Design a protein with these regions (language model features):
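Membrane-helix boundary connector in multi-pass membrane proteins
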Residues: 103-104, 119-133
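Alpha-helical transmembrane-segment detector that highlights a single hydrophobic TM helix
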Residues: 76-92
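Alpha-helical transmembrane segments and their membrane-interface boundaries
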Residues: 1-81, 127-128, 133, 149-153, ...
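Short, amphipathic, aromatic/basic-enriched membrane-interface segments that mark the entry/exit
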Residues: 48-53, 100-110
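Alpha-helical transmembrane segments and their membrane-interface exit regions
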Residues: 89-93, 139-149
Length: 163
């Protein structure tokens, strides 16, 4: 009986081959690293969601994609997982939004959007789309760091930009 229990425990931790463990590790590390890049930018600007938050969001999103793939779920099932993940991360991002004392003052929208994009990057990493994750991270980083610089340089107010 004890041998049967031990064999069951061992089978739960077994990985069929080195390729699979390498693939899983690579996807999780890529997700965490690229999420960390966006989190670093937010943290340097003193925003509430920084490196750790973005890394965990990206890695969590990658895990939510990897688990159904490993379980052999259909593409329809994976689609439902992605839909739930997108909605759930939207709820998480809502926590980053703060309403100021003035009714027109809302803070944290960019950080919330950054969390949402970070989750999408994690989903892409979990699906093995490393080039998509790298390009998306680069574009998001440009949006977060270069676009505000352009507005400051051109002395364009946000109300002018929205017209």
């Amino acid at each position: 009986m004890w041998q049967e229990i031990w064999n069951t425990v061992l089978s739960e931790f077994s990985v069929p081959d080195a390729q699979q463990i390498t693939r899983i590790t690579l996807r999780l590390v890529v997700a965490a690293a690229l999420g960390g890049v966006l989190g670093y930018e937010r943290e340097q600007k003193g925003k509430s969601a920084g490196v750790r938050t973005h890394m965990l969001v990206a890695m969590g999103a990658a895990l939510f994609v990897l688990i159904p793939q490993q379980a052999g779920a259909s593409s329809e099932d994976l689609s439902r997982v992605l839909q739930g993940l997108i909605a759930g991360v939207g709820f998480l991002g809502a926590g980053a939004i703060i309403m100021g004392t003035k009714q027109v003052e809302i803070r944290g929208l960019t950080t919330a959007a950054g969390i949402w994009v970070t989750a999408a990057i994690g989903m892409a990493a979990g699906m093995g789309r490393e080039s998509t994750t790298a390009l998306s991270t680069l574009i998001a980083l440009l949006v977060l760091s270069v676009v505000p610089w352009i507005f400051r340089t051109k002395k364009v107010t946000m109300s002018d930009a929205q017209e």
